[in-house]
Amino acid sequence: MDTVLRLVLGIIGLAAFVFVGLLVFGTVTDYNPPPVEDAEAHPLADSPALTDSTLSFLIWNIGYAGLGRDQDFFMDGGKNVQPQRGESDANFAGALSYLHSEQDIDFLLLQEVDRDAKRSFGRDQAAELAAALPAHHWYFASNFKVKFIPVPFDPFPFVRPIGRVNGGLVTFSKPTPTSAKRYDYPGNYGWPTRIFHLDRCFLETRYPLSGEKELVVINSHNSAYDEGGVLKAQEMAMLKDYVLAEFNRGNYVIAGGDWNQCPPDFDPKTFKKDESEYDQQNIPADYLPGWTWAYDGSTPTNRKVARSYDPATTFTTVIDFYLLSPNVELLSVQGVSLDFAHSDHQPVQLKVRLR
């Protein structure tokens, strides 16, 4: 009996030691970026300045090539932690092929692009995408940088962890920017959750125009898993102050990305499906009067990943779109239906004119 008791106590003690050690390791290695820092820059040796007033954009959360049509995800009620290698390769090949076909677009704002992560098998997705877009500068800002994520504890701890992650936002641009900076969003989860979670941010690139004005392009990815929208409210307040200050200086502002919330006055359940348990928030209608929310209300941009994609039942909505300052004229905006083949998000293309 004493032997059994010692064995049980030993197992409990070992588990406690590993758990505490994991928290210490996570805390010591926690990614803690400053409020503002230069983005990782990969400029071209020779590239034109911005001269045309009519510009094209594309936004897309590529889901680290891990959330294609056949995948689900444990944090959304599914079972999978990461895809099989062949599935990841196929998802990424599809995303890369599509983006290569759109290389004439001036600006491509991408989210959930991995640089080195277990979930994407160590592939530097940003560098491979850059090779397919040889006429574009590219800039990277990390928003998910963790040495080791132990979850999920299912069926047992450390059996199938997320592991290491380094991923974030990438902006590709044909015109030459004068600067590219990462701006840290305020707010975070409490300890210890925050040491294993994303550090949300936006990636800003600036382009000189005539008359000392600038075009300010913002690539943003706002919080998910945010009960009550507390984190998103803080992020949106910061973004509002920031873009208003830029507009009041006479600059042109275009912000796009994955907002993890629907645009004002858009019915989140426009594409009604059997899965209706999701409570999707809208950005308040009075957020920025006089500014333009550019989205395609006829094409869903996001699907829920509790199960693999079923066009007949999977809940879909619009959470990927653009915000334009009053001096930017919307010419067209179009969601691109790829049937969620490569990601749980779909691209959205935009054309604008600077007034």
Task: Name each model-derived stretch.
Residues Y64-A65, V113-A117, F144-K147, P177-T178, ...:
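Solvent-exposed loop/turn segments at secondary-structure junctions
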Residues Y64-D72, K181, R303-K304, S332:
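Short, solvent-exposed loop/turn elements at domain surfaces
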Residues P34-V36, K147-E214:
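A well-ordered secondary-structure block
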Residues D46-L58, G66, L169-K181, H197-N219, ...:
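Beta-strand-turn-beta hairpins that frame and shape the catalytic cleft
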Residues S56-I62, S88, G94-G122, F172, ...:
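Active-site beta-strand/loop signature of hydrolases that rely on acidic residues for catalysis
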Residues D2-I11, G21-A45, R206, A237, ...:
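Metal-dependent phosphoester-hydrolase catalytic domains
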